[in-house]
A protein has these predicted regions:
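Residue-level signature of outer-membrane beta-barrel architecture
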Residues: 32, 50, 95-97, 148-150, ...
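Repeated loop/turn-to-beta-strand initiation elements of outer-membrane beta-barrel proteins
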Residues: 24-26, 55-60, 102-105, 150, ...
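Short glycine/proline- and aromatic-enriched beta-strand/turn motifs that initiate or cap beta-hairpins
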Residues: 19-71
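Hydrophobic, lipid-facing positions within transmembrane beta-strands of outer-membrane proteins
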Residues: 42-46, 89-93, 142-146, 176-180
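Short sequence motifs at beta-strands and strand-loop junctions characteristic
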Residues: 38-40, 83-88, 134-141, 172-174
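Transmembrane beta-strands of outer-membrane beta-barrel pores
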Residues: 30-34, 62-68, 111-117, 162-168, ...
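Outer-membrane beta-barrel translocator domains and adjoining extracellular loop/strand segments
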Residues: 38-43, 69-77, 117-127, 170-176
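Outer-membrane beta-barrel "beta-signal"
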Residues: 97, 149-151, 155-157, 175-186
Length: 186
């Protein structure tokens, strides 16, 4: 009896791996975005895809980007210097549709969190006066994305996608970027 049970368990274990093969993909990639009236942001994107037993699958995505900028200018007798640091985080999820063995399209929706911190320093040359001002703005907004996944060979996945949102940081700023990644199917 034990030999029969062991044989059934062994057969099940050997065949179950074949049925679940290549149903998951983990991708890591480069993320880059342009921010309206600001410098660009750069960072990393992580995607996880689970393929169902149909052309449909589910994708989850996490993106982290950061960037900084500075500006210096004169206003009358004042010298002004602004420094800003921006951090962007997003968590998105959505469906993917496999067109054939090589190409899939996906759409994502979720939440983006943006934090901008900065300082302004001004110096008045005639009054010999120095002033400082600090700011910190946060925004949580709807984010969206779409893209293409290509499987050039069985266990490799390449991703090219778009991600965007509009952050309310004392005014609305459009953030539009792309994701370029490579992944492993298992």
């Amino acid at each position: 009896m034990n030999k029969i049970s062991l044989a059934i368990l062994l057969a099940f274990t050997m065949t179950s791996g074949a049925t679940f093969a290549n149903e998951q993909t983990l991708s890591l990639g480069y993320a880059h975005a342009d921010v309206q009236n600001f410098n660009s942001l750069s960072g990393v994107n992580l995607q996880y895809r689970y393929e169902l037993n149909s052309p449909l699958s589910i994708i989850g995505s996490f993106t982290y980007m950061q960037g900084d900028g500075s500006a210096q200018y004169y206003v009358a007798n004042d010298f002004v210097k602004n420094d800003v640091d921006v951090k962007y985080y997003s968590v998105l999820a959505g469906p993917s549709y496999r067109i054939n063995d090589y190409i899939s399209l996906y759409a994502l929706g979720g939440i983006a969190y943006v934090k901008a911190t900065g300082t302004t320093k001004w110096i008045n040359a005639t009054l010999d006066y120095t002033g400082h001002y600090s700011l910190s703005e946060k925004s949580t907004s709807f984010a969206y994305g779409a893209g293409l996944m290509i499987n050039p060979v069985e266990n490799v996945s390449m991703t090219l996608g778009y991600e965007g949102t509009e952050a309310d940081l004392n005014g609305n700023y459009a953030i539009n970027g792309f994701v370029l990644g490579i992944g492993y199917r298992f």
